[in-house]
Amino acid sequence: MFLNRLWQYIKRNKIKTTIGIILVVVYYFSLPKVLFKNDYATVIESKEGQLLGAKIAYDGQWRFPESDSVPHKFKTCIVAFEDQHFYKHFGFNPISMYHAFLQNRKANKVVRGGSTLTQQVIRLHRENQKRSYFEKFIEVILATRLEFRYSKDEILGLYAAHAPFGSNVVGLEMASWRYFGLQPHQLSWAEAATLAVLPNAPSLIYPGKNQQRLLDKRNRLLKKLWQDKIIDKETYELALLESLPKKPFDVPQIAPHLLQKTAKEHKGEKIKTTLSIYHQERVNDIVKQYYNLYKQNEVYNIAVLVVDVKTRNIISYVGNSPTDKNHQKDVDVIEAPRSTGSILKPFLYASMLDDGDILPESLIPDIPTQISGYSPQNYNHTYDGAVPANRALARSLNIPAVLMLQEYSVNKFYEQLQNLKLRNVNRQPSNYGLSLILGGAETNLWDLCRAYAFMSGTVNHFTSTQDEYRINELANLNYNFNETVDFGKSVQNKNIWNAGAIWQTFEAMKEVNRPEGDEAWQFYDSSIEIAWKTGTSFGGRDAWAVGVNKDYVVGVWVGNATGEGRPLLTGVESAAPILFDVFRIFPRSKWFETPYNDLEEVTICKNSGFLATNTCPGELKWVPKTAKKSKNCPYHKLIHLDQTKQYRVNSSCEAIENMVTDSWFVLPPVMEWYYKKKNIDYKQLPPFKEGCENNDVRKKMDFIYPTSFTKIILTKNFEGNTQPVIIKVAHSNSEEELFWYLDDKYLGSTKTFHEMPIIANSGIYIITVIDEEGIEIKRKIEIEK
């Protein structure tokens, strides 16, 4: 019935109906979808809600993003002060507007607006247009539309986020921090009342100015709250005693470089981060302490990143030390690519274990090495001859690492680094060559900590599920509290390395007595059980340290952001002390559980660390299951001895029935030369029995020049340069490689033409030449310049 009458009315009054529809449509669309298009400050908070830092909005205003809610005290104060009928009207208050009209007419100017909080939101939206009756009419229309769209609490939220609070402070949240150093929900009644009266006259807040006027307005509001029985008398009297803010608080700068990162990725947003305020401030203190120490050596920049392994959340993010602009304080070193030094060595060790190329204790050569003109050196410029792979990693020896990479291949290792998502390893493998393992590449602290967190997470998940891996174990690190990392489903296949290989790598990295002879280990706390590694780039430009246990990864970089190197800047002396100080502020963690399902017990040669043969003294060891692909011991050989076992013999000089066959651990000549000096229990091959060596040594190799006890006088050429003496040796197999020594100094090796130039100071020397079978000849000479 009603619809029929309405239809008849529409047909009779088409013009009125059309105008009405147009007005309704205009009214409906009178407010834009986004009411405020202002730029907001980028804000970061700790996981506890503590303000860590903020970056001012593009228009120069401290305007925080809108909050989800308005605290009770401020809500009560602002309603009592500005619009006590707020919850009763529908956008405007006719009575207040009428009283305002009378006052303005009497004063012959605008002295009172009579606006509700809803109208004030509209006025803020319209950027405070000049006051007029027409403008007031527009505000009323839009205010009613606003009430249709939003709830009362949402309207209060808009007001609290956009109201001016003096100077360039906009919004309750920023005002709360700026004037009281508190979050809005932490405000007292007096503080909330102070902020409630400010938007009415924002110029009142200036340090040392207008304090009495502001105090009077605040106290009147507090009295009203007491009279309205919102607060009791005791609360009212105590609130009156609270002083006004005098000096504005500075915006905290607790994580300035994470703020930079957030501003790039979440500009104009308020991000609740995963940072722990306690740990962030403690790490800041540690960095400041070491910065004050290191700057005396003109080392100005330090970065520390701490990751929770279980969640991959960032716990602490210190992108640089508290230096100045002259020393690049704004550079976020956590994201900056830097030379790796030795920090990638554990990845090579894990890769070779996982492929079965080595076992943890496999001997790796540590001898003078030259490969296509590339001559790596150990940090201490010494050689051990041969070192177990795990000790080579623990001591960060360079020569064994290069030889391991040569065996594994640069291309394969490059692929592994790509699998680890080290973004700065981005040139062709051939551009790196063998230097890839010694600092020829670059990485950053973020990617490095991500890789080590992946390793720890792999072992943790495998041991907790007995034999499973997560497909997204190498998940990116996360600093957003409202986001969680998705590790994907569990599967049987590994991502990059098996858990057993990673666990064995951590076992090697757990060693504490490295590098040998270094006096910097007084800071080391042996009760902190972590796997860790240091690295130092060429020229002392970068000092790295990374540590990992079941729960945390800590990464440290020390150096100059400009790339300037400094003497004494090393990973072990500069970065490692910071690493351990940071670990001390976290709870102690148990060591990784052993992933027995990815290990097997096999017989290992006691001497060489390779799979034992029937000629080796063996012992049972837990190794990765891939060990079955590893090499058998290449160093044990059967030799023939006489009955006393003091001399070697052969069939030309000893009856077969009198020979004793024994197994002997024999290293190649150069390896043996250095190994026996470091290992006093190493037994060299016994000498040949008299009458046997002529059939062996002298038939195979002898000196051509010089003869025994020759006195050699070094001469000079026409340019005044000393001419070397050429030592010559003949060998029955010209393709045999010979290794030359002058006393204990290794000179090099020769093939085909066995000639070695020598220049030395005046004195008596022993020349030693050893072939590939370990047969050696010696000659004493005297040199005179």
Q: Where are these predicted regions, by residue range?
A:
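Glycine-rich, acidic and aromatic/proline-enriched surface loops and short helix-turn segments
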Residues: R123, E127, A161-N168, H185, ...
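Soluble, non-transmembrane domains of envelope/secretory-pathway proteins that act on or interact
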Residues: K11-K14, T484-S490, E529-K785
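Surface-exposed patches in mature extracellular/periplasmic domains of secreted proteins
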Residues: F86-I95, V110, Y133-F134, L156, ...
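Juxtamembrane regions of bacterial inner-membrane/periplasmic proteins
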Residues: F2-N297, V309, N313-I315, N320, ...
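Residue-level preference for non-acidic, small/hydrophobic
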Residues: G49, I78, V121, I155, ...
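A penicillin-recognizing enzyme superfamily signal
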Residues: T273-Y294, V304-D308, Y317, D324-A336, ...
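Conserved catalytic neighborhood of penicillin-recognizing serine enzymes
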Residues: K106-R131, H185, P248-K264, I358-F413, ...
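Short pre-catalytic segments that frame enzyme active sites
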Residues: Q50-F64, M174, S203-P207, L259-K267, ...
